[in-house]
Amino acid sequence: MPQIAYADEPRINPLDVVERLAAVNDWSFERASDDEITILVTGKWTDYQVSYTWMGDIEALHLACAFDLKVPERRRAEVATLISLINERLWVGHFDLWVTEGMLMFRHALVLAGGTEASGKQCEALLGNALDTCERYFTSFQFVVWAGKSAREALDAAMFDTSGEA
């Protein structure tokens, strides 16, 4: 298989695109470094802390969307089951549980291999998908964590409630 040579031309940092997106939408943000930016977005159910990280070694823009719902140790196994049931339904991105901190988050990445540059539309779509997915399943996580429901009960109840909204 022939190798393809790519020119090492300077590229626009994808986090510059994300920063412009945050500024245009008047979202609070903090640029911790050239490779990381965190945006605060208010949702219907909770506030979201969205961190974008540029991973130059694999040429990917990683998104992690966390929300304030700590999972107590006694509910982690059921939340893990719920995450598995939800992730089966998702076409892109996935939920994760950071066990050491009991923190839930939605993760996704945009691969920009070969010098491809991120567009505003791509960064906006990445964020939109994360927020929509978190909003859709937030109540399921609440039902398991706070109401003591099983993963299946929580998912069924949340999907029923969501389908009833206009």
Language model feature labels by segment:
Residues M1-R20, A66:
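Terminal, regulation- and interaction-focused segments at domain boundaries
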Residues Y6-A7, A64-P72, T116-S119:
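Short histidine-centered catalytic/ligand-binding loop motif
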Residues R20, V24-Y48, Y52-L63, D68:
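Ser/Thr-rich, low-complexity intrinsically disordered terminal regions
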Residues A23-V24, T81-R89, G128, D132-T139:
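Short, intrinsically disordered, mixed-charge
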Residues S33, W91-H94, W98, Y137-K149:
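Long, hydrophobic, amphipathic alpha-helical segments used as structural scaffolds
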Residues A66-M103:
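Short, internal acidic amphipathic alpha-helical interface segments
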Residues W98, H108-L110, T116, Q122-E135, ...:
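Long, contiguous binding/interaction regions
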Residues Q142-A166:
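Short, highly charged C-terminal tails/helix-capping segments
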